Regions:
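A polyanion-binding, active-site-adjacent surface
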Residues: 10-211
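Intrinsically disordered, low-complexity proline-rich regions
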Residues: 4-6
Length: 212
């Protein structure tokens, strides 16, 4: 990011623009199959952005992303890596998502994966967030989130690595993370466990992280 870009993104108007955007996200009713309300982590002005996949059934009730068991795992990773609590993460990282509303359940009882149309509709919010914040570091969490920024076949191809990506007219570093879902053993077994540790080390060493 150029110095001029950085100064624009950190201007006094950034917080106001972000507040306005978050209000629009929370009021969104564009996807008829989605279960509202939309979930937001709030207007946190930060150089670091996380991108989740979509809220689960608990998040709309509790009013914040990663509010249930997967969140406990996610925040536990950062407690181990740098001593951050859940409150630290929420206060210092802007929390975005591929889709902002709970997609509902499948007939089999699992969470429904957002369809391509829903992902495309919700992508307007991510574009606006990137334009306003000009993040230096983006952390996509889970396969669906990673695929919005990087094309890949296997998690082992991307976890534990840093990528330089241009999206919505802005260039930033991307360090992917696996989804912390309890239904997935990937991050608890090798090589996933070691690759996750490597990814977290890259994150806490990133130049944007200490100043968050």
């Amino acid at each position: 990011m150029s110095n001029s870009q950085s100064s624009i993104c950190n201007s006094p108007g950034t917080a106001k623009r972000l507040d306005t955007l978050v209000a629009k996200i929370r009021a969104c009713t564009l996807c008829p199959k989605m279960h509202r309300p939309a979930v937001s982590g709030g207007a946190v002005v930060s150089r670091v952005m996380s991108i989740g996949q979509a809220p689960g059934v608990k998040e709309p009730i509790l009013g914040r992303p990663f509010a249930w068991t997967a969140g406990k795992t996610l925040y536990g990773w950062f407690t181990a890596a740098c001593g951050w609590s859940e409150a630290d993460f929420r206060a210092r990282v802007y929390m975005a998502a591929v889709c902002r509303c709970f997609p509902g359940k499948t007939k089999a009882g699992g969470d429904r994966v957002p369809d391509p149309g829903e992902i495309e509709t919700c992508s307007r919010w991510l574009a606006d967030e990137i334009e306003i914040l000009c993040p230096a570091l983006v952390l996509p969490i889970g396969k669906l989130a990673i695929l919005q920024l990087i094309q890949f076949e296997k998690l082992t191809d991307v976890i534990g690595k840093k990528f330089r990506v241009t999206k919505h007219g802005h260039e930033f570093d991307v360090i992917p993370l696996p989804h912390p879902s309890g239904a997935s053993p990937w991050h608890r077994m090798e090589p996933g466990k070691s690759l996750l540790t490597r990814a977290l080390k890259l994150i806490v060493k990133h130049e944007a992280w200490p100043g968050v």
